[in-house]
Amino acid sequence: MSLLNVNTIEPSTGTGVTLGASGDTITIPSGATIANSGTATGFGGITAASQWRMTTTFEGDAAPIASNWEVSDSTAYASLGSAMTESSGIFTFPSTGFWFVRFTGMIKTDNGADRAAYNIYATTNNSSYVQVTESQVFGANTGGSNTYASVSSEAIVDVTDTANVKVQFHVMQENNSNDTMGSSSYPQTGVTFIRLGDT
């Protein structure tokens, strides 16, 4: 093995320097430190994150929640990387990878002790959706007054093909007069998407 001692590597022409060839492994020894003052790309990691919310309150079941979604614009909020897209309640991922998905639902019961299920459904063929989580919330009876409660449901989705792997979000109410809460000011019922890394 040859040893090359240098303090600075600069390109002889242009602005790029290539280390090795495709398929090679570049090894950084244990205890070594990479000091980066610029922008590092191609290392995977968290490259995309966004939050969506449902803007309008509705009664009863929804399979899926097909309308009134928007990207959050609350104070200090910002999306990272490429954006998710939504059409009729179907969410499309902007890139392949392992994605963390959290669905939070808020219930308002009218006058009693009722439960609701807020579940994530996924497809791998852009057609048949399968339930992948089950989370239930219970609005306790408080003497006939309205009760509010929230629950979250989480999944890690392996998006191998953005054209076919998609998600949607369902709610099933025990009492169809109960509400799923929505707001255009902050997420009451909403979804968080975080890309964890490469598939």
Each language-model region and where it sits:
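Short, surface-exposed tryptophan/glycine-enriched loops
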Residues: 142-166
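Solvent-exposed serine/threonine-rich low-complexity stretches and specific carbohydrate-binding patches
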Residues: 131-143
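Beta-strand signatures of extracellular beta-sandwich domains
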Residues: 117-121, 168
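Extracellular beta-strand solenoids
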Residues: 6, 11, 19, 28, ...
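Short, intrinsically disordered N-terminal pre-domain segments
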Residues: 1-16, 197-199
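Terminal (often C-terminal
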Residues: 34-114, 124, 135-136, 177-199
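Short beta-strand-plus-loop segments that form exposed binding edges in beta-rich domains
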Residues: 170-176
